[in-house]
Amino acid sequence: MAGLQAKTLMFVLAAALATLGRTFVEADFSKNFIVTWGKDHMFMNGTNLRLVLDKSAGSAIKSKVAHLFGSVEMLIKLVPGNSAGTVAAYYLSSTGSTHDEIDFEFLGNATGQPYTIHTNLYAQGKGNREQQFRPWFNPTNGFHNYTIHWNPSEVVWFVDGTPIRVFRNYESEGIAYPNKQGMKVFASLWNAEDWATQGGRVKTNWTLAPFVAEGRRYKARACLWKGSVSIKQCVDPTIRSNWWTSPSFSQLTASQLTKMQKIRDGFMIYDYCKDTNRFKGVMPPECSKKQF
């Protein structure tokens, strides 16, 4: 009897792993991404990526496939030293004037000054939902994990496994939510000296070029976008591989909420929901809702 139970358990585990395998990929960059610009300013080799920026050009890639719900993650090491004027970006996006987008952007700074972790979300073409943080670690002396988790209930931004931001789904109350467009994954390194560092006051020092940002071990556990049919398929809880539809992912745990609040209390430097001057007192409607 014990032998039969063991065999049954092994079968169940094997089936679960097979199901997970259809949605989980540690990507070979050269096979799973294409260069969108700066082909001679980048290097892809297996699970390693190098993006290069000099005065002539930057570089960017995008995934060959799009996803609707799940999680994507990448280990990233940012430009060291004086990175003023540079922006490294890692984000999900669809296309068109009513596109959806979920952003991580890393705004460089002068030597000795901290980076800015810039997050934003667009739904049906509408953005202006920025939240910014100072890193509580050195993002240039090693690789750190940046994860975007996206399900029918909420979008969560994670840094090294700790949530830093949540955007919840209030579509039933007329607030747009990114749930009807497949999004591809993008990574880029580019010059944004007109605004990126201290409002554009500090420019890029091109004598320090080339600037290099690195990525490693990109992984996607996400629903493959197959067109409009995916809008229903990717939220179907009866499909075993749709793990993100589990009620356990509809809201952060108490422990996660505690960790996130510590980061937000200690390291958040901008929240659009508190910028009454910018919106002239007419705040975005989601700002009055439960945030987490």
Curated annotation (Swiss-Prot):
Active site: 101, 105
Domain GH16: 28-215
Glycosylation sites: 45, 109, 145, 205
PTM field: Contains at least one intrachain disulfide bond essential for its enzymatic activity.
EC number: 2.4.1.207
Biological process terms in GO annotation: cell wall biogenesis; cell wall organization; xyloglucan metabolic process
Signal peptide (residue range): 1-27
Reactions the enzyme catalyzes: breaks a beta-(1->4) bond in the backbone of a xyloglucan and transfers the xyloglucanyl segment on to O-4 of the non-reducing terminal glucose residue of an acceptor, which can be a xyloglucan or an oligosaccharide of xyloglucan
PROSITE patterns: GH16_1 (PS01034), GH16_2 (PS51762)
Location(s) in or outside the cell: Secreted, Cell wall; Secreted, Extracellular space, Apoplast
Paired cysteines (S-S): 223-234, 273-287
InterPro entries recorded: Beta-glucanase/XTH, ConA-like_dom_sf, GH16, GH16_AS, XET_C, XTH
Binding-site list for xyloglucan: 105, 118-120, 128-130, 194-195, 199, 278
GO molecular function, one term: polysaccharide binding
SUPFAM superfamilies recorded: Concanavalin A-like lectins/glucanases (SSF49899)
PANTHER family assigned: XYLOGLUCAN ENDOTRANSGLUCOSYLASE/HYDROLASE PROTEIN 8-RELATED (PTHR31062)
Family the entry assigns: Belongs to the glycosyl hydrolase 16 family. XTH group 2 subfamily.
Function per UniProt: Catalyzes xyloglucan endohydrolysis (XEH) and/or endotransglycosylation (XET). Cleaves and religates xyloglucan polymers, an essential constituent of the primary cell wall, and thereby participates in cell wall construction of growing tissues.
Protein name: Probable xyloglucan endotransglucosylase/hydrolase protein 26
Organism encoding this protein: Arabidopsis thaliana
